UniProtKB/Swiss-Prot annotation:
Belongs to the G-protein coupled receptor 1 family. This is Olfactory receptor 1A1. Residues 50-57, 121-139, 219-235, 291-309 are cytoplasmic. InterPro entries: GPCR_Rhodpsn, GPCR_Rhodpsn_7TM, Olfact_rcpt. Glycans are attached at residues 5, 264. It comes from Gorilla gorilla gorilla (Western lowland gorilla).
Length: 309
């Protein structure tokens, strides 16, 4: 009963990105700049794909889902950080902290599995072009997206429930600008050995899509290099280049965050999370649209339609 009362009244203090006021002011301005660009950029991708019938195919269906996930992903943390900075308060309730952690794990996993589905789509398109429409049918695409969301939720729920069962004594300062599982485990005065094992299991589940992406691209490049045509190789690189760039950015920052011992985590590592939670979702629309003629044409049509109306 006492633990329930503690959970209902407990508040955490979010130390921010650096914990230094002057630097926090800089990151506030940075986030104030990044967040609207992230929302507008990803929303434009979704609207362009929905409005252009030429983009109603598996590749762009998956891209639209990725853009939606990126909108939700950045919205879980940045608005709270901006609101806290404006109000001068750094506090977040226990329930709010768990909610934030749940959606970060959920959407992070969904993002990861969506990237794997996109790699699989490219592998099928290049290595089995004659069977592409059969394999990547609308039903298959829906199953891939639904599976991504289900796995994301299934991975997030156990971690959230386990964290909710922990006791927190004394220090309640979270070494980040949002509630993440790693700093919360470090704050707990409960036995966290099982929780740490579950966290690394979760990281393993999160890493499965990376293995799928690697296998997919091995298939892509083994197919491409069998074709004695420089043009074919260049076309494959142009088709897959944007996706590979996003995968490298995303997994590079995630590995910097989680592929390390729990004892090594400190406030300095919060800077890495800025790349994952804010910068990468902002860059994705630019990466996919600037290198894609069809997407640029669809965006141009969308702008022309809005201007003429």
């Amino acid at each position: 009963m006492r633990e329930n009362n503690q959970s209902s009244t407990l508040e955490f203090i979010l130390l921010g990105v650096t914990g230094q006021q002057e630097q926090e002011d800089f990151f506030y301005i940075l986030f104030l700049f990044i967040y609207p660009i992230t929302l507008i950029g990803n929303l434009l991708i979704v609207l362009a794909i929905c409005s252009d019938v030429h983009l109603h195919n598996p590749m762009y269906f998956l891209l639209a889902n990725l853009s939606l996930v990126d909108i939700f992903f950045s919205s879980v943390t940045i608005p709270k950080m901006l609101a806290n900075h404006l109000s001068g308060s750094k506090s977040i309730s226990f329930g709010g902290c768990l909610t934030q952690m749940y959606f970060m794990i959920d959407l992070g996993n969904t993002d990861s599995y969506t990237l794997a589905a996109m790699a699989y789509d490219r592998a099928v398109a290049i290595s089995r072009p004659l069977h592409y429409t059969t394999i990547m049918s609308p039903r298959s695409c829906i199953w891939l997206i639904a599976g991504s969301w289900v796995i994301g939720n299934a991975n997030a729920l156990p971690h959230t429930l386990l964290t909710a069962s922990l006791s927190f004594c004394g220090n309640q300062e979270v070494a980040n600008f949002y509630c993440d599982i790693t700093p919360l485990l470090k704050l707990s005065c409960s036995d966290i050995h099982f929780h740490v094992k579950m966290m690394y299991l979760g990281v393993g589940i999160f890493s499965v899509p990376l293995l799928c992406i690697i296998v997919s691209y091995i298939r892509v490049f083994s197919t491409v290099f069998q074709v004695p045509s420089t043009k074919g190789v260049l076309k494959a690189f142009s088709t897959c280049g944007s996706h590979l760039t996003v995968v490298s950015l995303y997994y590079g920052t995630v590995m910097g965050m989680y592929f390390r011992p729990l004892t090594n985590y400190s406030l300095k590592d919060a800077v890495i999370t800025v790349m994952c939670t804010a910068v990468t979702p902002m860059l994705n629309p630019f990466i996919y649209s600037l290198r894609n003629r069809d997407m640029k044409a669809a965006l141009q049509k969308l702008f022309n339609k809005r201007i003429s109306s």
